[in-house]
């Protein structure tokens, strides 16, 4: 009982001596925060989950939500970049410096107390190395004088004396450092005795310092045993080749100069796959193409063109009248740029092929619908390099392109017919001139006649004199009635009168021409007409008794109806 009473009395005295409120009041705000964090670590709240017990130890405020995937990707990129830098870095420590690394390891093992011995060994090794070099030089240079050897020995002695003095100074400094360290240790012990709560903080600090020193030692121990020339060589694989990645040898400045000068020998401008071409130069090329009249093909595939270049191309197509093929595939043009280009195609009648597939961004459904709508105003585009996602615009654009191809084919056929008629009339003129026939005699003798629909094409101009071949058939009759006075007509006029009478009995060709025109008009009308839909037969349906009854009721008469007694239930 006496021992228990003594312990209780000691506890009361200790509690009276250590007042917690006074201690907490004397602490600074920083010390209070540290004490709170230590208490949370020592005695965490059991009601909190494990993830909430360990708080963040960073002062920086969070910039966003935690994303594990992005963190892993960032760590992977850091590791890859560090590895690449280590492979590309030229080594600093070579094989010849193994002695220094061994000495550093020995110093790390011995500690701070053996520093003077290590310095002495290092100085002695340097002195021996210098002596060996001097001996080697003496052996190679035998013709040197003894005076020079004596001077070298004196210099070596002086160096040794200076090194010894340096060692003494270092020892004195180390002694002073040791005394300061002892003083700091004593002060720390006194602080720990007065404030037992700070003991744990000091322990953690010393642990961190030991870890840092071990890491620095490990970094110092790293070395490269052998030199690998492949690793020492500069690796240019990570560098982006800025000249011509795909082998396009186009001279940009020269090509731009030729485009501006409107060179007639330049029919194609190919800038494909020149990835590092400046945007300003691209705009210069497009603006120079506005007034060019000779380039037929303009290619800008995979050059990094964006919407500004697309708008410039739209303005170029509005003014240019020579480009037939435009290729802008594999760029960064969005739906707005493509729609602007398609909107300006209604003012262009020479472009036949447009390619804008494989863009960085999707055009979108609205842009595809707008493209199909704007293409209706263009009648010359024959090919389009793009795959539509929606089936509606795809079918509309396909039908419009087939329409343009049909118009192109019809125009080509008309040109061929005109060319054939020209050749036919030239042949008739050559025959009449070669045989000495009067004008119109070839037709009277049953020669081939041109198509009457093309008479307007061969009518003479108002200010030009009329030739014999260009005179219409009605005027030819008048010429035959009142022929000019050539020598042949004067010698034998009766023969022409006979031929004239014979020709009068035959049918004139004017109504034939009219009939042909009427036929052509009928053909055009027939083309515009639509076929009459056939009356489809009614579907075959089996007649039921109910249908028969209803049919009989419809076609029956009241006079033929028989009276029927009501059933008993209805009565």
Curated annotation (Swiss-Prot):
Primary localization class, coarse: cytoplasm
Coiled-coil intervals, chain numbering: 397-436
GO cellular component annotations of the record: A band; M band; striated muscle thin filament
Subcellular location: Cytoplasm; Cytoplasm, Myofibril, Sarcomere, A band; Cytoplasm, Myofibril, Sarcomere, M line; Cytoplasm, Cytoskeleton
Function: Essential for the organization of sarcomeric actin thin filaments in skeletal muscle. Increases the rate of actin polymerization.
Assembly description: May interact with tropomyosin alpha (TPM1/2) N-terminus. Interacts with KLHL40; leading to stabilization.
Family classification: Belongs to the tropomodulin family.
Bias (Polar residues) ranges: 94-105, 193-204
Biased composition (Basic and acidic residues): 119-134, 180-192, 206-228
Induction context: Expression is regulated by SRF and MEF2.
Region named Disordered: 1-29, 46-67, 91-228
Species of the source: Mus musculus (Mouse)
Pfam families named in the record: Tropomodulin (PF03250)
Name assigned to this protein: Leiomodin-3
Tissues expressing the protein: Skeletal muscle and heart-specific (at protein level).
Example of a GO biological process term: skeletal muscle fiber development
Post-translational modifications reported in the UniProt record: Ubiquitinated, leading to its degradation. Interaction with KLHL40 negatively regulates ubiquitination and degradation.
Annotated WH2 domain residues: 545-564
Gene, per the UniProt record: Lmod3
């Amino acid at each position: 009982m006496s021992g228990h009473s003594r312990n209780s009395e000691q506890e009361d005295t200790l509690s009276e001596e250590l007042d917690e409120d006074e201690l907490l009041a004397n602490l600074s705000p920083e010390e209070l925060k540290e004490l709170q964090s230590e208490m949370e670590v020592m005695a965490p709240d059991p009601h909190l989950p494990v993830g909430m017990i360990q708080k963040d130890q960073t002062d920086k405020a969070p910039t966003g939500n935690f994303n594990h995937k992005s963190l892993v990707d960032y760590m992977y990129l850091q590791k890859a970049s560090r590895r690449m830098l280590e492979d590309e870095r030229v080594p600093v420590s070579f094989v010849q410096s193994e002695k220094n690394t061994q000495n550093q390891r020995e110093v790390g093992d011995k500690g701070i107390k053996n520093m003077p011995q290590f310095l002495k060994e290092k100085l002695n090794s340097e002195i021996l190395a210098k002596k060996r070099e001097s001996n080697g030089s003496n052996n190679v240079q035998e013709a040197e004088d003894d005076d020079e050897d004596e001077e070298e020995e004196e210099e070596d002695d002086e160096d040794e004396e200076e090194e010894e003095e340096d060692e003494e100074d270092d020892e004195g400094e180390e002694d002073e450092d040791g005394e300061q360290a002892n003083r700091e240790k004593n002060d720390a012990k006194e602080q720990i005795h007065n404030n037992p709560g700070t003991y744990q903080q000091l322990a953690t600090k010393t642990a961190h310092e030991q870890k840092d020193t071990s890491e620095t030692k490990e970094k110092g121990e790293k070395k490269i045993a052998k030199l690998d020339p492949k690793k020492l060589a500069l690796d240019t694989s990570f560098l982006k080749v800025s000249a011509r990645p795909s082998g396009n040898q186009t001279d940009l400045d020269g090509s731009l100069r030729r485009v501006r000068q409107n060179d007639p020998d330049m029919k194609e401008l190919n800038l494909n796959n020149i990835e590092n071409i400046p945007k300003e130069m691209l705009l210069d090329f497009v603006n120079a193409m506005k007034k060019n009249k000779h380039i037929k093909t303009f290619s800008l595939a995979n050059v990094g063109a964006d919407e500004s270049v697309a708008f410039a191309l739209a303005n170029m197509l509005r003014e240019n009248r020579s480009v037939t093929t435009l290729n802008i595939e594999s760029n960064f043009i969005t739906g707005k740029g493509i729609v602007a280009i398609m909107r300006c195609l209604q003012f262009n009648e020479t472009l036949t092929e447009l390619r804008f597939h494989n863009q960085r961004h999707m055009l979108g459904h609205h842009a595809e619908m707008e493209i199909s709508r704007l293409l209706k105003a263009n009648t010359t585009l024959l090919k389009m390099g793009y795959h539509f996602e929606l089936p509606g615009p795809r079918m509309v654009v396909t039908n419009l392109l087939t329409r343009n191809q049909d118009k192109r084919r019809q125009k080509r056929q008309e040109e061929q017919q005109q060319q054939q008629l020209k050749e036919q009339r030239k042949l008739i003129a050559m025959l009449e001139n070669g045989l000495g026939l009067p004008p119109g005699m070839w037709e009277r003798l049953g020669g081939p006649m041109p198509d009457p629909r093309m008479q307007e094409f061969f009518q003479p101009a108002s200010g030009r004199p009329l030739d014999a071949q260009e005179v219409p058939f009605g005027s030819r009759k008048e010429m035959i009635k009142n022929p000019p006075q050539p020598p042949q007509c004067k010698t034998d006029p009766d023969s022409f009168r006979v031929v004239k009478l014979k020709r009068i009995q035959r049918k004139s060709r004017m109504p034939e021409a009219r009939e042909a025109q009427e036929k052509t008009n009928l053909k055009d009308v027939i083309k515009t007409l639509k076929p009459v839909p056939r009356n489809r037969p009614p579907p075959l349906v089996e007649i039921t008794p109910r249908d028969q009854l209803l049919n009989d009721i419809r076609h029956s008469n009241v006079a033929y109806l028989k009276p029927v007694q009501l059933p008993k239930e209805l009565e």
